[in-house]
Amino acid sequence: MKFLDEAKVYVRSGDGGNGCVAFRREKFIEFGGPNGGNGGRGGDVVIEAVDGLNTLIDYRYQQHFKAQRGGNGSGKDCHGAGGKSVVLKVPVGTQIFDEDRETLIHDFTTVGERFVLAQGGNGGFGNAHFKSPTNRAPRHANPGQPGEERWIWLRMKLIADAGLVGLPNAGKSTFLSKVSAAKPKIADYPFTTLHPQLGVVNADGREFVLADIPGLIEGAHEGAGLGDRFLGHVERCRVLLHLVDATCEHAGKAYKTVRHELEAYGGDLTDKVEIVALNKIDAVDPDELKKQKDRLKRAAKKTPLLISGATGEGVKEALRKLADVISEQPVSIKAKSTSDSAATEEPWAAPLPPQG
């Protein structure tokens, strides 16, 4: 299934049905009186968060959704039928924005959550409604009210417990494939991962969801590379695992490049708990490894973990530390406080330092 995390959609609720002008006509009843029924209510446009979806690809091929119009009233006090509503199904984690792409209308966070995006128009009154002691035979009825219409943006943000960040070719996809059943594309060239990937990880009996997003490069917030739009998928994460390639030219500079892009994106990403790990330690000699570790430690102001996604060295320790942070931090909390003792006791769990 193709991945799509943003779609523009047009929705229109149903118009209300018209009221009816009718009179009772029966044998031997000279003045039967009005009996025109009311129009039916138009259908709503409803959006529902469902389980089992992780893409908005369906809305690439169909962008227009219209609910059914309410039925017109008829004689013998028959009211029009209500219009059938339209239900748009989206993944959990989807946000609805107005046409300006900035005004948040609703955020879906739980399975089964429903939101009425456009209400159907009310049906018009038939002439029976207007009967009164002074007007025994009204000859007018109301038309149905028009429905609502609008353009909206659907934007999906994956719901994961932990997120993998780093430069392209930092080994994020290899790490994800090592610790979960996910099968991301792995190759020795930049931007192998073009879309976010999810994997379920089991660390000593504790399960959590890990998200791998495409790599960031310098200037990503200005559109370089694949840009930084995929960072939205780690906004809901409780902890970030920052992988730095031990074979790169300078581990400290690589770390700061990603940090700068996180700051430029915003979204409280820089306030999240971060675990820093030096990856691909099997591909460098001991002297170079020590040099890169020291560079990364100075840049991050914390002692990095040493891991290898290829051989599995240090991977279990990294998963345990991720699980520890996730178990301590509720889903609703987006950032770890600097006063939290759990964050200050362990150097790998300290909040991200401010960058000049």
Curated annotation (Swiss-Prot):
Residues 332-356 are annotated as: Disordered. Keywords: Cytoplasm, GTP-binding, Hydrolase, Magnesium, Metal-binding, Nucleotide-binding. Its EC number is 3.6.5.-. InterPro entries: G_OBG (IPR031167), GTP-bd (IPR006073), GTP-bd_Obg/CgtA (IPR014100), GTP1-OBG_CS (IPR006074), GTP1_OBG_dom (IPR006169), GTP1_OBG_dom_sf (IPR036726), OBG_GTPase (IPR045086), P-loop_NTPase (IPR027417). Pfam families: GTP1_OBG (PF01018), MMR_HSR1 (PF01926). Residues 160-327 form the OBG-type G domain. GTP binds at residues 166-173, 191-195, 212-215, 279-282, 308-310. One of its GO terms (molecular function) is GTPase activity. One of its GO terms (biological process) is ribosome biogenesis. It is found in: Cytoplasm. One of its GO terms (cellular component) is cytoplasm. Its cofactor is Mg(2+). It is an enzyme of class 3 (hydrolase). Residues 1-159 form the Obg domain. Mg(2+) binds at residues 173, 193. Belongs to the TRAFAC class OBG-HflX-like GTPase superfamily. OBG GTPase family. Monomer. An essential GTPase which binds GTP, GDP and possibly (p)ppGpp with moderate affinity, with high nucleotide exchange rates and a fairly low GTP hydrolysis rate. Plays a role in control of the cell cycle, stress response, ribosome biogenesis and in those bacteria that undergo differentiation, in morphogenesis control. This is GTPase Obg. The lineage of its organism: Bacteria, Pseudomonadati, Pseudomonadota, Alphaproteobacteria, Hyphomicrobiales.
